[in-house]
């Protein structure tokens, strides 16, 4: 499982031209087999050995709950008892932080979003995963396996954790008629100037690209994460125009709930869990997956190529997607579970229906975050696409 930085790893990084991170890719129904750049040559673990006694994780808040935040929310303690692996969790706030932490070699596994995954693969910081050592993998929805954000040339680099779509949420008393298009937030002459909200991340450029993909076909956009310079410039220009109408860029979903509750925001990008929270607080909001489709996220548990506790890491990956635990974390975090059997074990029996867990037709219109790279992931070989580092620079310019 250990490896050194080789010239091949450097070559892979150079080919990708990657920098910071947050990501995107195609729908669950596309690109089986994943991305096709050449990563460092690493071997997946072949067999499981004895527990090393502990595992060091990097995770999003809510993914490795041990009862310390809420005594009723704890799936770590039983894991420790059953496996003998003490869980040490470092909660990360951004994909960039996750990538930086993984590079230290001090952690065994990470719950990486698509915008971080390819960077970890290209740098040699993440190793291939032997899915045969993860028995619960067989019950993961097929639409989450072997995708651009979690595999390369048919080689799996992680275990799917869950998924969610970026929805269009609106105040039903302030926004009329009910919107069914992203034009509600991208129309330069919007009636809701100063009340539009947008997700605060460079990956949001993909949302603009998706809108242009559907409304300006002459640009030739086939994948919102594969933009040549002309396509990228068009998306950036659209977002610069939108900036005049944006009252707030959000990254903390509780702050977005507050903004809709106060009336500071009336329409914008949101998540299902935000909608549920706002409605529970009696905020008059609804959300829709617009006719153009949407971007979305699917997190993946990846193992470090320098893992000091790989057996415990594999045990953790199998545990976190086991039906009961996957149901618990999906409800607590607010997402669709990755394990199909989890749907019968949720406390809210409508959870999987609400989050479209088994509705693959729904996910066909969701373009999951995947790291934009110089090698166009839409299959073009006669041009270069704009890599994520340039997205980061452009995002600063967009926000002014």
Residue ranges and their predicted role:
Residues 18-21:
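C-terminal motif of bacterial Sec signal peptides marking the signal peptidase cleavage site
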Residues 23-26:
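Bacterial signal peptide processing site
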Residues 36-120:
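Early extracytoplasmic/lumenal segment of secretory-pathway proteins
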Residues 56-70, 106, 111-259:
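Extracytoplasmic ligand-binding site segments that recognize negatively charged/polar headgroups
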Residues 138-139, 236-242, 281-305:
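Periplasmic-binding protein-like
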Residues 167-174, 210-212, 297-309, 328-332:
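A bilobed periplasmic-binding-protein/Venus flytrap-type ligand-binding module shared by bacterial periplasmic
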Residues 295, 304-372:
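Mature extracytoplasmic/periplasmic domains
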Residues 365-400:
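Conserved C-terminal helix/tail region of periplasmic/extracytoplasmic solute-binding proteins
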């Amino acid at each position: 499982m250990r490896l050194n930085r080789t010239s091949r790893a450097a070559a892979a990084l150079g080919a990708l031209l990657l920098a910071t991170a947050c990501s995107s890719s195609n729908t669950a129904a596309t690109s089986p087999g994943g991305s096709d750049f050449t990563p460092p040559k690493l071997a997946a673990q072949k067999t499981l050995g004895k527990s090393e006694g502990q595992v060091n994780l990097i995770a999003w808040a809510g993914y490795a709950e041990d009862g310390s935040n809420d005594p009723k929310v704890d799936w770590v303690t039983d894991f420790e008892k059953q496996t003998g692996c003490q869980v040490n969790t470092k909660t990360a706030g951004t994909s960039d932080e996750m990538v930086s932490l993984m590079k230290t070699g001090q952690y065994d596994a990470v719950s990486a979003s698509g915008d971080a995954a390819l960077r970890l693969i290209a740098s040699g910081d993440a190793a291939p995963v032997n899915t045969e050592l993860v028995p619960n993998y067989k019950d993961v929805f097929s639409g989450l396996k072997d995708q651009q954000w979690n595999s390369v040339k048919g080689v799996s680099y992680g275990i799917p954790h869950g998924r969610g779509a970026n929805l269009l949420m609106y105040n039903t008393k302030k926004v009329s008629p009910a919107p069914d298009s992203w034009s509600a937030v991208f129309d330069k002459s919007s009636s809701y100037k100063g009340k539009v909200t947008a997700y605060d991340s460079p990956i949001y450029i993909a949302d603009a690209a998706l809108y242009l993909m559907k409304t300006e076909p002459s640009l030739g956009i086939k994948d919102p994460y594969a933009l040549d310079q002309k396509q990228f410039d068009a998306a950036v220009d659209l977002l610069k125009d939108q900036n005049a109408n944006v009252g707030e860029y959000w990254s903390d979903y509780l702050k977005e709930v507050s903004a809709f509750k106060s009336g500071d925001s009336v329409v914008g990008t949101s998540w299902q869990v935000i909608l549920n929270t706002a409605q529970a607080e009696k905020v008059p909001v609804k959300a829709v997956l617009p006719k153009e489709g949407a971007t979305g996220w699917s997190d993946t548990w990846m193992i470090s190529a320098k893992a000091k506790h790989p057996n415990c890491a594999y045990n953790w990956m199998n545990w976190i997607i086991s039906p009961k635990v996957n149901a618990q974390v999906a409800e607590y975090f607010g997402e669709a579970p990755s394990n199909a059997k989890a749907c019968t074990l949720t406390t809210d029996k409508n959870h999987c229906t609400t989050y479209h867990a088994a509705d693959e037709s729904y996910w066909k219109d969701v373009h999951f975050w995947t790291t934009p790279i110089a090698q166009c992931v839409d299959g073009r070989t006669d041009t270069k696409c704009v890599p994520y580092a340039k997205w980061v620079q452009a995002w600063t310019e967009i926000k002014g």
